[in-house]
Regions:
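Eukaryotic intrinsically disordered, low-complexity linkers and tails enriched in Pro/Ser/Thr/Gln/Gly
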Residues: 1-17
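Bromodomain acetyl-lysine reader domains
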Residues: 9, 20-137
Length: 137
């Protein structure tokens, strides 16, 4: 049997092993020293940045990703559609850091923190389980 090496492997339905690994990865990122600003949705009113939604039109945060992976209270999970593919999960994580860069600019301390967390994500992604091998007869 051969191993699929193309990036299309992440377009397949999420396996149980991938879901568990992704959830563990997100929880690890949230615990990082630099993870704090990315745990919850940006409260732009409390932070006094009312223009935030005009710049960041598709907000995302690690806590929301965790819920979409099945983490957190069951009644909260019902409000978050689960990921169908690993690609969708990866896209949401990348969106967190793209939004950070778009709003804060490249030299802001929060952006630097985001780069550190994203680097840890990239390292963890290298160990993401592949799809369960299927025999073809």
């Amino acid at each position: 049997m051969s191993t699929v090496t193309s990036t299309s492997v992440w377009s397949r339905p999420v396996t149980s092993a991938q879901q568990k690994y992704a959830l563990s990865t997100i929880r690890g990122l949230k615990k990082m020293k630099d993870g704090g600003p990315f745990i919850y949705p940006v409260d732009y009113i409390a932070l006094g940045i009312p223009h935030y939604p005009t710049i960041v039109t598709h907000p995302m945060d690690l806590g929301t990703i965790e819920k979409k992976l099945g983490g957190g209270p069951k009644m909260e999970q019902a409000n978050y559609p689960p990921y169908n593919t690993v690609d969708e999960f990866i896209a949401d994580v990348r969106l967190v850091f793209r939004n950070c860069l778009s709003f804060n600019g490249p030299d802001h301390v929060i952006t630097q923190m985001g780069k550190n967390v994203e680097e840890a994500f990239n390292k963890a992604l290298k160990n993401m389980p592949g799809p369960e091998e299927v025999s073809v007869f």
